[in-house]
Amino acid sequence: MSVSAKQVKELRDATGVGMMDCKEALQETDGDFDEAVSLLRKKGQEVADDRAAVEADEGLVVTAVSDDGHAGAIVEINCETDFVARNEDFQSFADTAAERVLEETPDDLEALESLPYEDDVTIEEELVALTGRIGEKLTIRRFDVLESEEGQIISYVHPGSKLGVLVEVHGDGEAEETGRDVAMQVAALEPIAVTRDEVPDEVKEEEREVAREAAVNEGKPEHVIDNIVEGKLERFFEDHVLMEQAFVKDSSVSVKDMLDDADLSVARFTRYALGD
């Protein structure tokens, strides 16, 4: 069957699929637009099924923050190659998915995939269709949402969109600029907790065990080993606890000192590095 360029363009605009694939779909369905859309979705699912066992360890980390700053979402979406991670359609999908997560705060990935993407299409359906168009395995790996009635959610995404951070900031100071500094600190230095009290007991105990074993192996006197262990634990806190880290923009002060001067505090943070 002969199909017009107008029909092909309409199907292309509706699905984003390549012109030749749209033409073939219309020919196979005798020019029926709805049937052609359904056929293209089916082919997209076939591609997704074929690629299911393939590793997808490239992708993007994206964030979205509400207009009032009281909520933020962070999402990691994976693909097979960095080339696709730079694809405009893939990036647009990732940004839209983050916006939907922010709006709907789903409980899990299954609920996220059931959210509306646009019109009558769900996020899962759009992901399958995009898989068909791009030809790579695409997956939504994880997401998180921070909400705060009193605080501000500040986001930072490192250039390249492989690393992103959300930080919840409280206080009367200038939250936007300082919060971004803190988010960049979290991105760069990978703290595991805001304060030392939040470090899990098993982590502290493991650090003590490692320090004690090292001291014994070095032949340190028994009566000084406890002090050595606690000293190394203090240094561990300085390296891995946000409030005790040296501020990256001024290493002469700690992050806590910087925040105190700014009349701000940090309640929590979320850090996503691609593939972690």
From Swiss-Prot:
CDD domains: UBA_EF-Ts. It is found in: Cytoplasm. Residues 81-84 are annotated as: Involved in Mg(2+) ion dislocation from EF-Tu. SUPFAM superfamilies: Elongation factor Ts (EF-Ts), dimerisation domain, UBA-like. Keywords: Cytoplasm, Elongation factor, Protein biosynthesis. Its main location: cytoplasm. GO terms for cellular component: cytoplasm. It holds the Pfam family EF_TS. It comes from the Bacteria. GO terms for molecular function: translation elongation factor activity. Associates with the EF-Tu.GDP complex and induces the exchange of GDP to GTP. It remains bound to the aminoacyl-tRNA.EF-Tu.GTP complex up to the GTP hydrolysis stage on the ribosome. Belongs to the EF-Ts family. This is Elongation factor Ts. It comes from Salinibacter ruber (strain DSM 13855 / M31).
